[in-house]
Regions:
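Conserved SAM/AdoMet-binding glycine-rich loop
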Residues: 1-103, 108-110
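A structural motif corresponding to the C-terminal end of an alpha-helix
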Residues: 4-5, 34, 91-102, 128-136, ...
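Flexible glycine/acidic-rich beta-alpha junction loops that bind and position SAM and/or redox cofactors
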Residues: 22, 74, 78, 108-116, ...
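Catalytic cores of alpha/beta
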Residues: 51-53, 111-129
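Short, hinge-like loop/turn segments at secondary-structure boundaries
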Residues: 56-58, 83, 121-123, 159-162
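Generic recognition of well-ordered alpha-helical segments
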Residues: 91-94, 124, 144-145
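Radical SAM enzyme core and accessory elements
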Residues: 153-158, 164-253
Length: 253
């Protein structure tokens, strides 16, 4: 690859990179031997230790992408991930410590998802962004949607709900639509039970909550807030009725 195509960077697409430590270390050694930078996509937070991350970093690893899925322990348990939110923080903190970029992937729309669990995920993303010192929009995080596939519990659940047909032609039609399509919103089948308008809003809610949490933790808007208070305070002092112009209602659950 290097000699014929001048390749200098390798992206590894794996289901669980690092679960076989011997294999992962050998891959890192080989890529380092050929002076290649690399990025492993598809890493489980409990499959890498702080020492592993350092080992990979020292051998040319520029990024590790963890399947975070959710910042809500409730949803992680529904997914049967068998790890905790703290486990995810530990892995990402290791990446931050060793200067390894870590884009994260989350998933919305699982059975049991609601505004509270979505907000928890948004807070999680905002916390990570705060640790890195960058706004969430620069994290390169992916928002996926729960997509049932044959042979999975999610598929069986969809059949039980009646949102996935059991006849052969129904299955063929569904698989034709989602084959190689990715877990994106336009292919989402509502397994949640909440109104679809509410479900689709969750994508915006998780982004809003991530941004709100980031600003709260970093207090980046403090200076602007103080200037705003001085300006609006002067206007209101001259004419108190102007304060009504900017009245806003809080969003509540």
């Amino acid at each position: 690859l290097k000699e014929n195509y001048d390749v200098g960077f390798i992206q590894i697409l794996d289901e669980n990179f690092g679960s076989n430590k011997k294999h992962a270390y050998e891959v890192a050694d080989i890529l380092h031997k050929h002076n290649l930078l690399w990025f492993a996509c598809g890493v489980r937070c409990t499959s890498t230790t702080n020492a592993d991350i350092k080992y990979f970093k020292d051998r040319g690893c520029s990024a590790l992408k963890y399947g975070v899925e959710s910042g809500s322990q409730k949803i992680l348990d529904v997914m049967e991930k068998v790890f905790t939110v703290d486990d995810v923080y530990k892995a990402l903190d290791g990446c931050i410590e060793h200067n390894v970029f870590s884009p994260i992937a989350i998933m919305l729309g699982m059975p049991g998802e609601n505004e509270s669990t979505v907000e928890a995920t948004g807070k999680f993303v905002g916390n990570i962004a705060s640790k890195l010192g960058v706004h969430p929009k620069y994290l390169a995080w992916d928002i996926m949607w729960a997509l049932p596939l044959p042979g999975t519990p999610l598929w069986e659940y969809g059949e039980q709900l009646g949102v996935i047909g059991k006849e052969d032609e129904d299955v063929v039609d569904y698989l034709t639509r989602v084959s190689d399509a990715g877990t994106y919103k336009r292919y989402y089948i509502n397994l949640n039970g909440a109104p679809i308008s509410e479900v689709l809003f969750w994508e915006y809610l998780v982004k809003f909550e991530a941004s709100r949490t980031f600003h709260k933790l970093n207090n980046v808007n403090k200076e602007l807030s103080e200037k705003y208070k001085k300006v609006t305070g002067g206007v209101i002092a001259v004419n108190p009725r102007n304060s009504l112009k900017y009245t806003a209602l809080k969003f509540t659950q």
